[in-house]
Amino acid sequence: MPDKNLMVSLCDELSTAARIIGAVNTVVNEDGRLIGHNTDGIGYMQSVKDAGYDIIGKKMTLLGAGGAATAILVQAALDGLKEISVFVRPTSRFYDRLVHTVDELTEITDCRIRICDFSDSNLLKKELADSAILTNGTSVGMAPHEDTCPVPENLTFPKDLIVSDIIYNPRETKLLTMAKN
């Protein structure tokens, strides 16, 4: 398993995203200088665009604050989303890092970022009402726990909401099945 955090100290320079995230997964040698990048968020944002969706200037609701979710949060803010509501458990080991990341993004972008309690299903419903996209950045629903879902099973999604999941196994999670129905 690569050590994305250790790579930060081995680089001469970091991209803005890599610096904020604190992790590097791609190193480019530019005339002997090692430039560290984090492409996780870039890849996610490109996949949304490739699927035909333009979410720049709009609102995202993001579930989770782990490594992948943080990369998505950072890139979405850097790319120009207007607003992001991040749902995380206050007891999460990632919570303090999330607060720091949000503070840093608030200083360098115009994106409004709100940290929300993951267990507040009423607030989730309210935030989704004016969101363009819901992104599951957690592992909830990943094999071998395919029967789990990060949102309440009785949640009704707004008609035009894009629902995405970073989970790759199973290919269609319970969350995505709920969104299709």
What label would you give each PLM region?
Residues 79-109:
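NAD(P)-binding Rossmann-fold cofactor-contacting core
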Residues 1-51:
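Phosphate/diphosphate ligand-binding glycine-rich loop within oxidoreductases
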Residues 43-48, 54-55, 67, 72-74, ...:
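Active-site glycine-rich loop that binds ribose-phosphate moieties when present
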Residues 36-38, 57-81:
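Glycine-rich adenosine-cofactor-binding loop
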Residues 7, 92-98, 171-174:
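Short, charged/polar "capping" segments at the starts of alpha-helices
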Residues 30, 53-59, 157-159:
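Short helix-loop-beta connector
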